[in-house]
Amino acid sequence: PITDQFNQWLDEVREMLRREVDYDLEAHTTRHFRRILAEDSRFVVPEIIDEYSSHNIMCMSFEHGISVNDPAVLELSQQRRNFIGRAIMELCCREVFEWNKMQTDPNFGNYLLRIGEDNAHDQIVLLDFGAIRDFDDDVLGPGREMIRASYHHDAERLKRAMAALDFLSDNPPPRLLEDFSALCFEAIEVLQDPDRFPPPAHVLNVNGEYLWGQSDLPTRIINRASRNALSLHFDVPPKEFIFLARKLLGAYTFLHVIESQVRGNTILEPFLHMREADDRAKVEQKTNN
């Protein structure tokens, strides 16, 4: 059925297409990311050449590199691939928890890898800022709360965050909430503390690091969802949740392809408490209205 949520999705698609050809906006966003990442030598953001740019043309500096799935990447040492993977996941966390500004199109065409003489000089080139989207705490706050609740395996906290996002249909059966909580708790295993909540043994090495390249997590999530018929009780998901899920899946896929071996919890944990009190207050406000 054509619902308000569905119409909001159509409006969002139209807005995304408009932003993709708004070169003034993309140039502004590119400059912004170049500025906030200027002190982080792991990342390269092209420079906008104003002299040759206009409303219809955006001219940038040429930045060399190889594609993420180039065979040369897997020839790098494990340490170097871990360095790259950690950098991309940390960037994802900064977008979600710190900046409220997210690259909503995390396909590999938006990245290049610049291989240095050693891991200290490997860099990630960030391209195409046309799909950057700003979020306010009204919409991203409950999404962050879903991440925190999943990380702590806190089903009640997760339920409140879902309610704040209007995620489920009215009066969902308790079994559905239990099944969806279990799905979220499994989905976050890549960022989970393996000592608290161990994932399947085949995705950990002897040091307790997550084997992203061997992970079959998406398949397990799909199987769990279809097994429990979760989709029967869902409204059209809020677009903000889909953007967040797509962002996290994009980061997961990046680390999966380059076969990183990284404990995700050591990346996520420094960000978990950012905006936490405000996010919890926002969830309470939205669920009590």
Positions of predicted regions on the chain:
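Residue-level signature of catalytic and energy-coupling elements of molecular machines
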Residues: 26, 59, 107, 128, ...
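Conserved protein-kinase catalytic-loop position immediately C-terminal to the HRD catalytic Asp
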Residues: 55, 109-110
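Conserved ATP-binding subdomain of kinase catalytic cores across diverse folds
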Residues: 1-69, 87, 98-99
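Helix-rich C-lobe and terminal helical cap/extension of kinase-like folds
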Residues: 11-13, 54, 63-67, 71-87, ...
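Catalytic-loop of the protein kinase fold
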Residues: 98-108
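Hydrophobic "anchor" residues on beta-strands that sit immediately upstream
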Residues: 57, 103, 124
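Juxtamembrane "helix exit" motif at the C-terminal ends of alpha-helical transmembrane segments
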Residues: 35, 102-103, 256-260
